[in-house]
From Swiss-Prot:
Residues engaged in binding (6S)-5,6,7,8-tetrahydrofolate: 108-111
Function: Attaches a formyl group to the free amino group of methionyl-tRNA(fMet). The formyl group appears to play a dual role in the initiator identity of N-formylmethionyl-tRNA by promoting its recognition by IF2 and preventing the misappropriation of this tRNA by the elongation apparatus.
InterPro entries in alphabetical order: Fmt (IPR005794), Formyl_trans_C (IPR005793), Formyl_trans_C_sf (IPR037022), Formyl_transf_N (IPR002376), Formyl_transf_N_sf (IPR036477), Formyl_transferase-like_C_sf (IPR011034), GART_AS (IPR001555), Met-tRNA-FMT_C (IPR044135)
Leader sequence segment: none
Recorded family membership: Belongs to the Fmt family.
Keywords attached to this entry: Protein biosynthesis, Transferase
MF term (GO), any: methionyl-tRNA formyltransferase activity
Native source organism of the sequence: Xylella fastidiosa (strain Temecula1 / ATCC 700964)
Organism classification: Bacteria, Pseudomonadati, Pseudomonadota, Gammaproteobacteria, Lysobacterales
Annotated EC: 2.1.2.9
Enzyme class: transferase
Any single Gene Ontology cellular-component annotation: cytosol
Protein name per Swiss-Prot or TrEMBL: Methionyl-tRNA formyltransferase
């Protein structure tokens, strides 16, 4: 079975490894090298690094719409194109090239959380369950029929980074299972997505990291988890902007205005929200690194606590 693999970030690497064990990967498509780091040097994607290490041919077009790129893809004669977090839109002209079409590994239980940031949006919304889907691609955004899926609970204190790593491995396993069935002549039966329950996971933005104490504590705690490891939640704490790496929601009755520091100890800094309180457990001052609450309090002896 001849497969073209298309993917870019860390999430796609386990799936690439899985495909190489099941089929002949004739080419890997990934996004062009991007400037990164303080020196803004061009850096290859994680998928490119993995592909090069395995001796696989790598292609990095800006778009898949040009006649030259389409002809290149046709010349590869793929039986199947596998797409995992590629980040480049596949036009209909590409979808019709392989005999078995194009498969996509998506990090949610479709139709919930179609789009670019399904992991973060699931945690932000307080979802208790998510999963991965193997989808037959069509022209719409994550609208294709689902071939297979796997479910998993979202742990109470799980961050986006932690869930990302679990779902990446689950997606690789699901893809392996699907390819195994296809090779055996038992092609998974496509199931159309339900018309109800559709939600969209729009791309994360840096501006979203700023938390508002006028929100319930439970919602803010979910956002802290959702924004790890990026963009990292930010708050204003007694006049200082700090980043929050870990926090807990407290079901606490109080009569103080949102943003008021209710208590401060080595266990955490409890801040009044419009409903409940948010306990800050791990913080980062501007220009510094993430530190414990105890270390932060040693540096902020001016912190005003109002019972």
């Amino acid at each position: 079975m001849r497969i073209v693999f298309a993917g870019t970030p860390d999430f796609a690497v386990p799936s690439l490894r899985s495909v190489t064990q099941r089929a002949d990967v004739v080419a890997v498509y990934t996004q062009p090298d991007r400037p990164a780091g303080r020196g803004r040097e061009l850096m290859p994607s994680p998928v490119k690094l993995e592909a090069v290490a395995r001796g696989l041919p790598v292609y990095q077009p800006q778009t898949l719409r040009s006649p030259e790129v389409l002809e290149q893809l046709r010349a590869l004669r793929p039986d199947l194109i596998v797409v995992v977090a590629y980040g480049v839109i596949l036009p209909e002209a590409v979808l019709t090239i392989p005999d078995d079409g194009c498969w996509n590994v998506h990090a949610s239980l479709l139709p919930r959380w179609r789009g670019a940031a399904p992991i973060q949006r699931a945690i932000e919304a307080g979802d208790t369950e998510t999963g991965v889907c193997l989808m037959q691609m069509e022209a719409g955004l994550d609208t294709g029929p689902v071939l297979m899926s796997l479910k998993t609970p979202i742990n109470a204190h799980e961050t986006s980074g932690q869930l990302h790593d679990r779902l990446a491995e689950m997606g690789a396993q699901l893809l392996s299972d699907g390819l195994g069935l296809l090779r055996a002549g038992l092609r998974p039966v496509p199931q159309p997505q339900l018309a109800v329950g559709v939600t969209y996971a729009h791309k994360l933005g840096k501006v979203e990291s700023r938390l508002d104490w006028e929100q319930p504590a439970e919602r803010l705690a979910c956002r802290v988890r959702a924004f790890q490891p990026w963009p990292v939640a930010e708050v204003v704490l007694s006049g200082e902007r700090v980043r929050i790496h870990e926090a807990l929601a407290l079901d606490l009755d109080h009569s103080q205005p949102p943003g008021t520091v209710l208590a401060a100890s080595k266990e955490g800094i409890d801040v009044a929200c419009v409903q409940g309180a948010l306990r800050l457990c791990r913080l980062q001052r501007e220009g510094g690194k993430a530190i414990t609450v105890a270390d932060y309090l040693n540096a902020r002896r001016d912190l005003q606590v109002r019972a």
